[in-house]
Amino acid sequence: MTEITAAMVKELREKSGAGMMDCKKALAETNGDMEAAIDWLRAKGIAKADKKSGRTAAEGLIGVATMGHKAVVVELNSETDFVARNDAFQDLIRGIAQVALTTDGTVDAVSAATYPATGKSVADSIKDAIATIGENMTLRRSAALEVPHGVVATYVHNAAGDGIGKLGVLVALKSEGDKAVLNSIGRQVAMHIAATNPLAIRAEEVDAAVAERERNVFIEQARESGKPEAIIEKMVDGRMRKFFEEVALLSQAFVINPDITVGAAIKEVEKEAGASIEVTGMVRLLLGEGVEKEESDFAAEVAAVAKG
């Protein structure tokens, strides 16, 4: 039996928003398994889906760049927001995004590519910037999307300047249609992705493990009702259909016009575009996603200083 520590209870409480005693019981019931404990709380109706687990803490900026039928998004982290507002830092991430356009978009490829302003690799150029600015920096994530015909639309939220901000989105639309129409609907869909963070483009593309986890939670919730298994199965199937509608891009209610789905909104502009439109890819990077920032205990710091 795993020992349930105060730190574990605190972590579960922060992730689930549930009470301390509920968290302690959940951990005891699941032998200290954090993810299973979250599911246990959800099944009991004590906690909602774990939306706090990907806590955003790191500073820095997200940068996007476009060239022809290709676009990239990169994340450059810094220790403080003050440095992220520095012109040199902003120029650096814009430059890195431009370099990323010449690669396959992976962090390794971008890091190894030559940064024109210095003639060195991007990785070494970041090291030089660290020495100059005096703060650690990390090229944490990078991604690229490309279509042979169509557009890759971009959107930056909380923009700190041209092409840089706290959240960046790419969405690839494959089409032979009018570019102006494609860019317009593409930007709207990118804004939608920024707002809703869909798990996949289509329901059938949702990760099987994620879907299975949801189904198991729904089964436990339904069993709490005490209804027969046949009824429970129908209840779960209904909840799963709703789950897929809510997490798959094309079946989500369009934030710009909630009366229709994203898929329907795209279909509506096909006539104006003069060709069919297919969403072939999407990327959404939120600054610091999944990175825990060290939080100092002010009271403990004062106590430590007082003790000399």
UniProtKB/Swiss-Prot annotation:
It comes from the Bacteria. One of its GO terms (cellular component) is cytoplasm. It holds the Pfam family EF_TS. It is found in: Cytoplasm. Residues 80-83 are annotated as: Involved in Mg(2+) ion dislocation from EF-Tu. Keywords: Cytoplasm, Elongation factor, Protein biosynthesis. One of its GO terms (molecular function) is translation elongation factor activity. CDD domains: UBA_EF-Ts. The keyword Membrane does not apply. InterPro entries: EF-Ts_dimer_sf (IPR036402), Transl_elong_EFTs/EF1B (IPR001816), Transl_elong_EFTs/EF1B_dimer (IPR014039), Transl_elong_Ts_CS (IPR018101), UBA-like_sf (IPR009060). NCBIfam families: tsf. Belongs to the EF-Ts family. Associates with the EF-Tu.GDP complex and induces the exchange of GDP to GTP. It remains bound to the aminoacyl-tRNA.EF-Tu.GTP complex up to the GTP hydrolysis stage on the ribosome. This is Elongation factor Ts. It comes from Agrobacterium fabrum (strain C58 / ATCC 33970) (Agrobacterium tumefaciens (strain C58)). The gene is tsf.
